A protein has these predicted regions:
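Cys/His-rich microdomains that often coordinate metals
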Residues: 1-5, 21-24
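Short linker/helix segments within small regulatory modules
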Residues: 2-16
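Short metal-binding segments enriched for Cys and/or His
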Residues: 12-36
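Charged, flexible boundary elements
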Residues: 40-63
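Beta-lactamase-like hydrolase cores
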Residues: 60, 64-87
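RNase H catalytic domain
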Residues: 71-72, 78-82, 97, 101, ...
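Short beta-strand scaffold segments in enzyme catalytic cores
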Residues: 88-92
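A short, polar/acidic, helix/strand-boundary loop motif
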Residues: 97-114
């Protein structure tokens, strides 16, 4: 603390700065918790780690992770930076066996567009009579399709707060979602160790490894 500040506020005793707060100290004391995880970045790409830090191959994912459902369609997408180049990935598994997987890349995109693209491709690979859970780690995208989009549609694809972002993707995804009435769209936490969500994340970052 500068002496000038202490002279200006006589009698005041400094407690601690944000850098040395008890909350930060507790976080740093946790085993295997890197300092950078204290302040997590927003968006599906970097919940707790950046896209580049999470850039595992699919084989590395299978070796490292074992938790989570063994049946379902898992999706992920993101860009680095946001906006910027990005990718999406989808894997459909049944009893731990891969039924299908897809991934793609866009040189100029956003996190949300890639998340929507991943979900769109997920429903494209499923037959219309499929009965399976489809997972996304984007709560925004899940709520958009399951809660908000039907209301926007009734109002002529308008919402009170302004234009609907990524409207063409939202409309396409809503049509595909409705064409699969026995499928359930669910949110799952990002980078929580769920094996097949991590696998979808790896597919979504394949474009980065392909550049090397």
């Amino acid at each position: 603390m500068p002496q000038a500040a202490l002279d200006k506020y006589a009698g005041w005793e400094p407690r601690y700065c944000r850098e040395h707060s008890p909350q930060r100290a507790r976080a740093l004391d946790k085993p295997n918790t890197p300092a950078q995880s204290v302040a997590k970045s927003r968006g599906s790409v970097g919940r707790g780690r950046s896209l580049r830090e999470a850039n595992l191959t699919t084989n590395e994912v299978l070796d490292k992770f074992t938790d989570g459902p063994e049946t379902g369609v898992f999706t992920d997408g993101g860009s680095a930076p946001n906006p910027g180049p990005g990718g999406w990935g989808v894997v459909w598994v049944k009893d731990g066996e891969i039924q299908a997987e897809r991934y793609g890349h866009d040189p100029d995109t956003t996190n949300n567009r890639m998340e929507l693209m991943a979900l769109t491709e997920a429903f494209k690979i499923l037959p219309e009579d499929a009965e399976v859970e489809v997972f996304s780690d984007s709560r925004l995208c899940v709520q958009t399709i399951t809660e908000w989009a039907p209301g926007w549609e009734r109002r002529g694809w308008k919402k009170k707060s302004g234009p609907i972002k990524n409207l063409e993707l939202v409309q396409q995804l809503l049509r595909l979602y409705r064409a699969h009435p026995r499928c359930t769209l669910k949110w799952t936490a990002a980078h929580s160790g769920t094996r097949w969500n991590e696998y979808a994340d790896s597919l979504s970052t394949a474009w980065m490894r392909d550049k090397k």
